[in-house]
Amino acid sequence: MRLTHQLGRGTKVHLLLDDEYQITTSTTFWAEHYLPDGTEISEDDWQRLVQQINERKALNKAVELLSHRDHSAKELRDKLLRTADPAAADKAVAQMLDAGYLDDEKYARRLVRHLIEDKKCSAYHARQECQKRGIDREIIDRALAEQAPDNVQTAKDLILR
């Protein structure tokens, strides 16, 4: 199989095998893994290159998503699976966990605090929201124990609004 590339718009590079489009990557990735046009590449080497491209795309998407707001590990993985294969999504989540950019414990504490203090939600509702986002039950229990909402006072506050 003969590998060639074409520059796309912006920072995109299109990779072709035997003059047929296969996949798009970034100029940064291509600069790091450059192969001259016309290089003969084996099926195994091609599959490794495609996997590296997919892993980089998943990692970039994870960084982009986490730059907007916090996510639970499950929530981030689910979003990555919309555009990435499971292996690439899992690797990106693991890298974000290792780097400390993803922490379900901290996320649960912030989410519970926001829901109870700012939104005036009950502990039950906060638990449901955390479970919906894929946070482990034990982590939710600890976050709720730290917050200890007063549901009676919350109900009074809502009635008096």
Range-by-range predicted roles:
Residues 1-161:
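An alpha-helical, amphipathic repeat domain used for nucleic-acid recognition
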